[in-house]
Amino acid sequence: MKKGTVLNSDISSVISRLGHTDTLVVCDAGLPIPKSTTRIDMALTQGVPSFMQVLGVVTNEMQVEAAIIAEEIKQHNPQLHETLLTHLEQLQKHQGNTIEIRYTTHEQFKQQTAESQAVIRSGECSPYANIILCAGVTF
């Protein structure tokens, strides 16, 4: 049995294949996922698993250099936005690097998901609960 934090074989596999600056998306249940992009569907029912649960597991295993978030989250989901920023701050301390946070429009965000290695869909049902993680290096 794998000893690491990620037991899901699809998520573990995609993280292990990430190269520097490759991207991985963690999204809510409603984000449209391009047909050309690998979909890893974790959603069981509304809210299960939550966006933050999925993000926490992914970032325990993935070295993150930058994060892209839809600008609209600030207005339409401020509580999750604050939780997300706190998580990224803690991740910076744990990794020992600065994580650049970039904001974009939701429309541009959706277009960028097509270039990611995979999209991991959570059961989150709150607005703009999506993030694009850019892979860093551990050396």
Swiss-Prot record:
Protein species of origin: Shigella boydii serotype 18 (strain CDC 3083-94 / BS512)
Protein name, as recorded: D-ribose pyranase
GO cellular component: cytosol
Keywords of this entry: Carbohydrate metabolism, Cytoplasm, Isomerase
Reaction catalysis annotation: beta-D-ribopyranose = beta-D-ribofuranose
A Pfam family: RbsD_FucU
Pathway info: Carbohydrate metabolism; D-ribose degradation; D-ribose 5-phosphate from beta-D-ribopyranose: step 1/2
Predominant subcellular localization, coarse grouping: cytoplasm
A Gene Ontology molecular function term of the record: intramolecular lyase activity
GO aspect biological process, one term: D-ribose catabolic process
Localization of this protein: Cytoplasm
Subunit architecture: Homodecamer.
Similarity comment text for this entry: Belongs to the RbsD / FucU family. RbsD subfamily.
Function: Catalyzes the interconversion of beta-pyran and beta-furan forms of D-ribose.
Active site: 20 (proton donor)
Enzyme Commission identifier(s): 5.4.99.62
Residues reported to bind substrate: 28, 106, 128-130
Keyword Cytoplasm included in the entry's annotation: yes
